[in-house]
């Protein structure tokens, strides 16, 4: 099987020659320049030969042009620290103007993607990271997000509509350069962030506007960030795979397969195992994840980005783990009614 065939078989629940596998990471410093960002991803893909390549621009790339100020301070995830947030008042929410996605930070990301798609194995699906509109607004408002949301809900809705429209224009601009899907990052579908009722109003409608507009044939991944996620609330999203911190929070892989019809991505602890563990632990967790799923609708990975300081031996061990796994065996994972 080639990579695209393997991915399609995995998310459709069909036999695979081996489980697909992928890791992704930030490239701090390199993410400030299109050529450097592209070169880093191209090298990463050629080194490890992942079944798909998730491109990871700076986490604020969708809102940088609104005036977000950040600095690289050494975070092990590779993310930049916030220096200042441009939104603090309701009137600043409604004043957010549409962005020209062919200029500025959006354009930087697109130029990098164009180089990546031209350089990597055409059999490898390239995914662009897209942050949900609510996640984008958090990057603009910081800790002011929830007070604004609760005190000025209409102004928040206006801002979310603007950010959604920006996102859709950016995605449309990617359809001609070889991108094969998106990695859609949701950071607020969690009991630690807001209530289910709040997410139903300020998260889900805007998520669906984006996900329902994606081109047919793309491979799209939903990422649920954090603990105590509202998995069941998003299990009907029109995506081919879901990724979450399966080793740290409910549901486990087995349970998720009964609630979501596509593929599940995970199996390896991001910090305890990939960063601080040894290759033998990687192999043990990978085999356990295979056992949980029977290798069916299963893609080996971690719950989030690979720490930039993770040992190279651990990344190699994760990539090599699938080579010794059999094709999937029938498993009794049935969707719940």
What are these regions (language model features)?
Residues 77-115:
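A gly/proline- and charged-residue-enriched helix-loop-helix capping module
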Residues 15-88:
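N-terminal capping/small domains of soluble enzymes
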Residues 29, 91-95, 320:
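Polar/charged alpha-helical tracts
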Residues 1-28, 40, 100-337:
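Active-site loop segments of alpha/beta catalytic cores
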């Amino acid at each position: 099987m080639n990579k695209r065939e393997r991915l399609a078989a995995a998310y459709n629940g069909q036999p695979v020659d081996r489980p697909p596998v992928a890791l992704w990471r930030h490239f701090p410093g390199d993410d400030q320049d299109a050529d450097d960002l592209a070169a880093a991803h191209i090298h990463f893909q050629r080194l490890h030969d992942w079944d798909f390549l998730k491109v990871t621009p700076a986490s604020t790339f969708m809102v940088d042009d609104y005036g977000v100020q950040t600095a690289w301070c050494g975070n092990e995830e590779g993310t930049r620290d916030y220096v200042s947030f441009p939104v603090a008042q309701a009137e600043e929410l409604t004043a957010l103007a549409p962005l020209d996605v062919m200029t500025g930070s959006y354009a930087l990301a697109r130029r990098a993607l164009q180089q990546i798609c031209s350089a990597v194995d055409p059999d490898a699906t390239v995914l662009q990271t897209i942050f949900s509109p609510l996640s984008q607004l958090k990057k603009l408002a910081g800790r002011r997000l929830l007070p604004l949301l609760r005190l000025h809900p209409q102004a928040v809705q206006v801002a979310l509509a603007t950010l959604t429209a920006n996102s859709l224009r950016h995605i449309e601009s990617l359809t001609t350069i070889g991108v094969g899907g998106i990695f859609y990052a949701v950071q607020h579908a969690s009991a630690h962030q807001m209530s289910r009722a709040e997410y139903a109003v300020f998260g889900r409608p805007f998520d669906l506007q984006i996900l329902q507009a994606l081109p047919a044939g793309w491979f799209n991944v939903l990422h649920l960030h954090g603990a105590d996620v509202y998995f069941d609330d998003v299990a009907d999203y029109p995506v081919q795979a879901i990724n979450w911190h399966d080793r740290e929070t409910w549901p486990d892989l087995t349970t998720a397969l009964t609630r979501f019809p596509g593929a599940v991505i995970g199996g390896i602890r991001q910090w305890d195992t990939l960063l601080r563990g040894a290759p033998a632990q990687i192999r043990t967790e990978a085999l356990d994840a295979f056992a949980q799923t029977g290798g069916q609708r299963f893609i080996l990975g971690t719950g989030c980005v690979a720490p930039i300081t993770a040992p190279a031996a651990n990344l190699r061990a994760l990539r090599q783990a699938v080579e010794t796994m059999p094709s999937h065996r029938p498993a009794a994972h049935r969707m719940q009614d």
